[in-house]
Amino acid sequence: SFPASPRAPTAIVAMVATLGFPAILTLSRVSTRPEALRGVENPSPYGYTVSLSLFLLPVIVLSVFHMIRPRHHTHRRALLAASGVIAVLGFVLDTFFGHSFFTFRNEAATLGIRLPAWDWSALRWVPAYLPLEEFAFYILGALFVITTYLWFSEYWLQDYEPQEYQANTQTVGRLVQVSWPSLALWTALLALGLVFKRIGPDPDGFAGYFIFLMVLGFLPTFLFLRAVAAFVNWRAFAGSYAALMLVSLVWEATLGVPYNWWNYKRDQMLGIEVQAWSGLPLEAVLLWLVIAWDCVIAFEIFRVFFHMDRKPMQALFGHGAAAKE
């Protein structure tokens, strides 16, 4: 008989079920078509809350698998550390900029538990503005991307054996190595976005969300990209990004924005919208890439760091870079 393989049809069936069941459950919460929403009081009861199962169920399935059978003990530590960093970044986004960038008009789609948000225009806290579900998303979204990346990397598109990976980390002089080509590209894209905001169809306001994504979403990773790029399984990254896009097309483009679980303050956007997705702004689509990129890069930074077995300052900057005996 043929040896067991993760590519067996049972693995594919399990994957489809893990994504399909929460998708069916989420879609079942909707009782009205988007074009018929006018005058409908509650078209998607608890829809936002239930939709988080799109991330929760895959996270549970893949996390249990990874925790039971990690290829190396550093994977578990790196997964938790990277997920924590990305979740904190999401908390900062919502807590300090959620009032500036987002609206949450459909309270019936949530549990009704809301947290305060900072209003920069009035320099005060706005009580009961952010749905609790927002914070759950940032935790689950980070875990979803990293566990999916690990699944692709270890069981479908493997690049390294654990021993080879660990040996290669010892050749890294320091983690902080600025990627100047990436920084130059980042600068050009940032400038292009700001120019477009001023000469585009919606010049009023300020491209705050775009700037946030570019500065806090991409820029920090360029400090480490040269050091960890060789350790990233780029095929697995593509797989995890594709999985996130698939879920996001259902979660945000089909449901979240059309049913006003959340929406965007247009004066804080560039003005580029996808009309087929209820005017979804470009920044929302860019966030899908930011989440996937940050999660994978952060995971590999922590994984390389834990394998290096050096003191933090030595690992980051190469001072006394020899590994501990």
What does each model-found stretch correspond to?
Residues 1-325:
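Aromatic-rich, lipid-facing transmembrane alpha helices and their immediate juxtamembrane interface loops
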